[in-house]
């Protein structure tokens, strides 16, 4: 039986859950060789998730696939413990990306619709996130919808990234700002 929720005075059925997050490797859109998925990882909509060869996913991480988005994680990428990735708006992570523990990557947000209704009940808008090859996302950083992190870029611990990061840039802070550019 569906639970009823009130939305602006009208009762409507609550949408079904996306499931428990439990998964089988055979459910993934693609899973490469030598993939390590630690205990306690939850994967929602694994049929929309692709993991390349040699990907590591740390314990307690949530890969929140979405029925109409794709999540693609490239070969050799390392995902630390207790990360949260949401791919309603498509998420593409390149090869050999280092992702520290507790990183959040979000591809959706609530649309601004004024104060006539609660934010929770506003439309969901999506925007893809791209993290290019060889980038590094520091512990606890947050990547917001629509952001493109360039090749070899480095995001500092705890940074909130709301705009694009150029290739080989080092950014940090809230909001994230350019600190320097990496050189050979």
PLM segments and residue spans:
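Flexible, glycine/small-residue-enriched loop-and-beta-strand segment within the central core
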Residues: 15-18, 40-51, 56-147, 174-175, ...
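C-terminal/domain-terminus segments
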Residues: 148-172
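Serine/threonine-rich low-complexity intrinsically disordered regions
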Residues: 7-9, 24, 133, 151, ...
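Extended, small-residue-rich solenoid/repeat segments and analogous flexible loops
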Residues: 1-48
